Amino acid sequence: MKKSYIIVFLLLFLNCSLLKADDSIDLPKTMVWSTYGLASSSYPEASAFADALMKNYNVRVRLKPSGTGIGRLLPLKKKRVSIAFLGSESFFASEGIYDFAARNWGPQNLRVILARPNTFGIAVPANTDIYKIADLKGKRVAYTTANPSVNVKVEAIMSFADLTWDDVTKTVFPAFTASVKALQTGKVDAVGAVPSGPGVYELAASKKGIRWLDMPKTNTEAWNKLQNIIPFMHPEVETLGAGLSKDNSVELGGYRYPTLTVYADTSEETVYNFIKAIDLSYELFKNITPVMYRWKLDLAVGTPVDAPIHKGTIKYLKEKNLWSEEDEKWNNQRIERLNTLLDGWEKFLEKNIDLTDEDFTSKWLEERKILLAKFLK
């Protein structure tokens, strides 16, 4: 009996210790996050995070879905949400391009908290004569209207072989799903896609099969060209996705999606407590979807990424010995690049206030190229 009391006491003591450790994480009791729409692959991930915070820390999270980058970022800018689950718009916004080249936007001083590793590549049917990126010359390559996230990645990958949209037959589609279906029906020869994304599994399962065009890490010259267009992409070996496995891997473009994003003025302690809470809740959500394991801390941090990493994240990573000198160097250079754009934008606004919206955007994009010339590889 005495032994039983001792065991119960120890269990209670350990439980209290755990609660005390949990109490050291200071989070608001309610949070609102902007996310991709309900049908997206990232919405269930945001939902899993929210459930974990509720179970572990009694934090109620409301998700605010939107199908557009502006719709996800504007609430963050207006401080109606505390965190935005973004895609490549975190890069576009920090750079002041595409939708964010307008005079009411411009470069945004964003910071990344966490970002899941992902890959992107160009897929072709396996029964074609397209084996490498250079073989795309003269072929029909999908271009999706109003989807710069996909299009700029395809453009960057084509630069691997010194190709541009002028060297291929740009085949325009109204939506990404339509372009993937067209690949299956033979109406287009190549599509940029995520290996674990919608549609590509159907192609892999068909008689045509699927082939991913290799992007060898050893081709540093080609990677430099690519990173001049999208500096957040890096070489990555992919084993997960349509037609892929550990025994049939391919080197693709690594990037991060979704990126949990805030503005730079978000407090260090707020971000520190959030990332710590997510890290300590990993066991609760790691099996929710096939890719959730990639939110493990040592995978979901690091560089390169779409925008500089927040100082609160860096503080926690240093405690976990997950922040390297290379990461520090990259982050400092990325902040320098962003500050160059922020300063340049303010000067540009003062000088060009009377321009029409169309001329304003066009002239800003020219100015941006000049500002960033010193960062080209």
Go through the PLM ranges and name each one.
Residues S88-S90, Y98-F100, T128, W165-D167, ...:
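Pocket-lining segment of extracytoplasmic ligand-binding domains
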Residues P28, P195-K208, W212, E269-V271, ...:
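An extracytoplasmic/periplasmic, membrane-proximal ligand-sensing/linker region
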Residues D26-N56, R60-R62, T119-T185, S196-P198, ...:
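Bilobed "Venus flytrap"/periplasmic-binding protein-like clamshell domains
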Residues S17-A21:
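Sec/Tat signal peptide C-region and signal peptidase I cleavage site
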Residues I7-N15:
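Bacterial N-terminal signal peptides
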Residues R140-A156, F232-V301, V305:
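Ligand-binding clefts/hinges and TM-proximal coupling segments of bilobed small-molecule sensing domains
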Residues E45-A52, R62-N104, I122, I130, ...:
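Pocket-flanking alpha-helical
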Residues M1-S4:
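Positively charged n-region of N-terminal signal peptides that target proteins for export
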